[in-house]
Design a protein with these regions (language model features):
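UBC/E2-like fold recognition across ubiquitin and ubiquitin-like conjugation systems
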Residues: 1-57, 68-274
Length: 274
């Protein structure tokens, strides 16, 4: 199918606007690069805000534009994805991004007035302080809201920061999707600069969240009843670092993880990005 000239002109207009207003995006830790060979593709990086569970994390998206753009929305694929962890109700482990503006979620649907620029800001709002509240029917008093924030905070450092940097800067995991890694590498300079500038802040972020979620550290969860019990005494926890572990279960998505907060700072400190 040939590409409509109106579609080409509109995509070019959207990209030109982003280039002219890049500072307003970067000030919100949003970055966009359009494919230099295929006008129907674009790529985005959103760095999580510090006051959310996504703090300093690198979240990548691929845009695939339809031949009738802007009368239909682009298909947006989520790339910061290990295939197991559900980082957000709107971000599926198969890469699907569910947003009303993309016609993939209930609510106000896509119109031709929307642009790449507006989509980027909408995506950034998904990475919010209490992401589980994006799930229909979940209220602030739900048992999983606090636990899910804790899990996302942990996996954000482990995967969206440390693993992503190892993939991009050190080619660590050859089994990871090569195409996705190539997209991530388009932003390598930004990753290197921001991590170098924020390394100590990331450690502070880890420490702050360790205090914030102190009630969940050293707590094990019965995955059937989702009840809690303290696994070790405070004195034992202070004397035995390996006991600072949480067996966490998020019933909404049936996520089960063994978390050890002590390893996160080590993962960060081991990263030396030139």
């Amino acid at each position: 199918m040939s590409i409509n000239n109106a579609t080409i002109k509109r995509i070019a207009k959207d990209v030109k606007y982003i280039m002219a207003n890049g500072s307003s995006l970067s000030s919100e830790n949003i970055y966009y690069k359009h494919d230099e060979e295929n006008i129907m593709k674009g790529y985005a990086l959103i760095i999580g805000q510090r006051d959310t569970p996504y703090g300093y994390g690198y979240y990548f998206f691929e845009f695939n534009f339809p031949y009738n753009y802007p009368f239909a929305p682009p298909e947006v694929r989520y790339l910061t994805n290990d295939g197991a962890m559900r980082f957000n109700p709107n971000l599926y482990i198969n890469g699907k991004v569910c947003l009303s503006v993309l016609n993939t979620w209930a609510g106000e649907s896509w119109t031709a007035c929307q642009t790449i620029y507006s989509i980027l800001f909408t995506l950034s709002t998904v990475l919010c302080a209490n992401p589980l509240l994006n799930e229909p029917g979940i209220r602030e008093d739900h048992n999983d809201v606090h636990k899910y924030n804790y899990l996302v905070t942990y996996k954000n450092v482990e995967f969206a920061i440390c693993k992503v940097l190892r993939l991009v800067c050190f080619d660590e995991d050859k089994s990871f999707n090569k195409g996705d890694v190539m997209i991530m590498k388009l932003f390598k300079a930004i990753l290197s600069e921001t991590f170098t500038n924020n390394k100590e802040k990331i450690v502070e972020f880890i420490n702050a969240n360790r205090v914030k979620y102190h009630d969940l550290i050293n707590v094990s969860y019965n995955v059937n009843s989702v009840s809690t019990s303290v696994s070790t005494s405070v004195s034992e926890a202070n004397s035995r670092r390996h006991t600072r572990r949480t067996n966490l279960h998020i019933s909404v998505y049936n996520l089960k993880y063994d978390l050890d907060y002590d390893i996160l700072k080590k993962l960060v400190y081991e990263l030396n990005i030139a």
